[in-house]
Amino acid sequence: MMWTALAIFSFFCLLVIYLYRPNPRIRKTKLCTNHYAHRGLYDHGSGIPENSMMAFRRAKHQGYGCELDVQCTKDGKLVVFHDDDLKRMTGVEGLVSQLKYSELENLRLLGTNERIPLFKEVLDLDLKELLIEIKGTQARQRVVLALLK
């Protein structure tokens, strides 16, 4: 009797495990199956800065989607730039959120001819897929509202 109960219990345990196992036939979402170039397909050693138009064009050419960082300037323009501070990428002191776009547009990224792009310029590239990270702790609401325009 005990062996019969144990066999029935074991059968039900195996049935539960079988029914709740991951199904490999379930289609994965694009987010899980596509490849994304983080901040564009950049290569600082080759003079292709992160979050630059050149990096995004390179990613598009090689078939990647792109992850990028968006933040709002003082005058409400959406720019693609990772750091809150400009120093690492431009050599200039200052915060993106405290400067107008007219003060940013002539800055060069890592000494190249690449500049800080407007988000609209990146959208105009018609990239395959985009993952957009909203930067700046104080201005998230402004960025979201600007994205919705």
Predicted regions and their residues:
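Phosphate-group recognition and catalysis centered on beta-loop-alpha active-site segments
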Residues: 1-149
